[in-house]
Amino acid sequence: FERAGETETIRYPLRQRAPGSAARRGFGPRDVILNLMPDRYADGDPANDSLPGYTDRADRAEPGGRHGGDLAGLSERLDYIAGMGYTMVWPTPLMENNQPTHSYHGYAVTDLYRVDPRFGSNDDYRRFVAAARARGVGVIQDIVPNHIGSAHPWMQDLPTPDWINNRGVFQPTRHARNALSDPYAAAVDREDFTRGWFVASMPDLNQRNPYVANFLIQH
């Protein structure tokens, strides 16, 4: 680029990818993606449906309860998924959701580093990804940087008072999603959708806090 009559050249090398590196091409328009909810898909290990220390127990008679699907069930059906022509499988979040109710969907995370034991273990997830890859199927990891679960340990002692939007007090959004893309939307609607919580069980992370932003980037 040029600046005040000066020219500066910045050089950087394009190196050969290291064997076995994790830097791979992502998904795109060429892919056929299967989006599924693991708890509702297939139960390959009934022994982990309900576990000590996890208050939301399996109950197939309850529409909002857990139904027992897990990584073992997903792994058992990879041949079927590949045979249907899918090139990518996108499970909803698999991280721990130790919420009192409605933990099946995975979007109220209480441990950002641990697969929910009712789905399996971190090692089970690695094996699932490897098994999918062996069949030519990629795995999209669903992560949730917008919010956490209300039972997350942070909610017992927030790192900073403004770690959560509205200082940890539930403030629902009106879900005016188009306010973010509508050039004529009212500022109050943009603010409401940006800072409001989806539901009381999903405290909204304040990404304007530089420590929150740094945590999300690094982790």
Q: What positions do the PLM features span?
A:
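Extended acidic/polar, glycine-enriched regions
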Residues: 1-27
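Extracytoplasmic/cell-surface-exposed regions of Actinobacterial cell-envelope-associated
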Residues: 1-10, 40-41, 81, 217
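Generic structural motif
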Residues: 4, 15-19, 39-44, 210
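Generic structural detector for well-ordered beta-strands
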Residues: 11-15, 35, 206
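Compositionally biased low-complexity segments at domain edges in trafficked proteins
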Residues: 22-49
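Substrate-binding/active-site clefts of carbohydrate-active enzymes
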Residues: 42-219
